[in-house]
Regions:
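Fold-independent oxyanion-binding glycine-rich loops
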Residues: 73-76, 125-126, 227-229, 300-301, ...
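Tryptophan-anchored aromatic micro-motifs
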Residues: 223-225
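Active-site and channel-lining beta-strand-loop segments
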Residues: 236-253
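Dual-mode signal for accessory low-complexity, basic/Gly-rich regions
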Residues: 250-336, 340
């Protein structure tokens, strides 16, 4: 499927489908919301009606659809957008209608393409525009994409065993990184046969590796802060998110503050801060003012991290790779949206039972309140990470990562790439 270019079908959050790299990212940014010219309730209802008709007409083809096989690229220069007064934007009413359409369209798609009957696979390769080291970076990307999954699977099991004994996890930043998060975890009714974390190697997401869960929202709170992260084609600077009861309460980024002249006044700073907040809401949260924390994960691919640091390309890597290079947090839906009732088992035979949270479980009462159609990962790189600590019910503290290095027994081999 070719990526849409018309305003009727264009996704403001980015391109979906096969497409070339953009010749003008500022142009794309300026025209994200051109549909604001005509977006009203009549249009929303008509678009939903056409969607239903199209799926009914092609239901045989939809039933045979197994899911996407995606090849991403990376290496373009990082992009920091400039807000233009002339660019269209949604009014509050249009934003509400847009979100309502997303909520109403998701059950339609799931009716014809059930989430528990499809999968996906995704991989990324560098472009020559990444610089003079392209050939070497390409070779190392191949190495990263073909790491020994059995070795990582065993190492990650040590992390999961520690996490399954936790009441909650504490994540702290290091240096200028102000992250201070408490992540509450789902309860296990039978620890002998159940686990909270999926042992993820390279079965769908390439490269490997991570362990991830759907956090319990109640009790999950604190500040997430990242100095720089590349999401949806935009480099976010000094990104922050505050969480309370597992839900985003405030966001900010320094993209527009950084661009101000040294003698900017307070009003200019206030406007730049608000522009940064809106950028996060539009590009990361897909117009939602608040979202739950849908995922907490610990990435273990220190080889990818070492490569990125060696070539100085961390801010040009896609989130597909970056999410494996430290702990990451996704806002929006869980990793199991629309397939929560399908059992999932780790290689050790334990069932991964933390497939729901307090929001997704609402699907049993009102599906429109359970999903957001959003899942955006935000990673803290190892160098900005102070510690990840398991806190057990009795108060015992067990370190998984300290000062950017794996210290949990059984995981020390992951530090070899960092030492090189």
């Amino acid at each position: 499927m070719r990526a849409a270019v018309d305003s009727v079908n264009k996704n403001p959050a980015g391109r979906a489908g096969y497409t070339s790299s953009s010749p003008n990212k500022q142009y794309d940014y300026d025209h994200r919301y051109d549909s604001a010219v005509y977006y009203d309730k009549a249009f929303r209802d008509r678009k939903l009606s056409v969607l239903k008709t199209a799926y009914e007409q092609y239901k045989k083809e939809a039933a045979e659809y197994a899911g996407p096989a995606v090849v991403e690229t990376f290496g373009e220069d990082s992009f920091s957008p400039v807000n233009k007064e002339e660019a269209w934007s949604f009014t509050e009413k249009q934003q509400r209608l847009f979100l309502e359409y997303r909520n109403l369209s998701m059950p339609v798609v799931n009716q014809y393409i059930p989430g528990d009957e499809t999968s996906f696979t995704i991989i990324a390769f560098p472009l020559p525009s990444i610089g003079p080291d392209f050939e070497e970076i390409f070779k190392e990307t191949i190495d990263i994409n073909t790491l020994d999954y059995v070795k990582y699977q065993k190492i990650q099991q040590h992390i999961i065993d520690a996490l399954d004994r936790a009441e909650y996890v504490e994540v702290l930043g290091n240096g200028k990184n102000r992250t201070n998060l408490r992540i509450d975890l789902a309860e296990l009714s039978d620890p002998a046969s159940q686990t909270r974390f999926e042992n993820c190697v390279a079965d769908v997401n390439i490269p490997l590796g991570e362990v991830f869960t759907s956090p319990r929202l109640s009790g999950t709170e604190g500040l997430l802060h990242v100095g720089s992260v590349y999401i949806s084609g935009i480099q976010f600077k000094d990104l922050t998110m505050e969480f309370k009861e597992g839900r985003v309460t405030s966001v900010s980024c320094g993209n527009f503050l950084e661009a101000l002249p040294p003698l900017a006044g307070e009003q200019e700073k206030k406007e730049a801060a608000e522009a940064g907040r809106k950028l996060v809401v539009q590009e990361i949260m897909n117009q939602h003012e608040t979202l739950p924390m849908g995922e907490f994960a610990i990435g273990t691919n220190t080889t990818a991290y070492a490569m990125a640091e060696r070539f100085g390309i961390t801010d040009r890597l896609p989130i597909l790779i970056v999410e494996k290079m430290g702990p990451h947090f996704a806002v929006g839906d869980t990793c199991y949206s629309w397939s929560e009732d399908s059992p999932m088992y780790n290689p050790d035979g334990k069932e991964m039972t933390a497939r729901d949270n307090e929001v997704s479980i609402l699907r049993k009462e009102d599906v429109s309140r359970a999903y957001f159609g959003v899942h955006k990962d935000i990673t803290i790189p190892y160098k900005e990470l102070g510690s990840i600590t398991v806190v057990e019910p009795g108060g015992t503290r067990v370190s998984i990562i300290k000062d950017g290095r794996f210290v949990l027994p059984g995981t020390e081999e992951l530090n070899q790439a960092l030492d090189r």
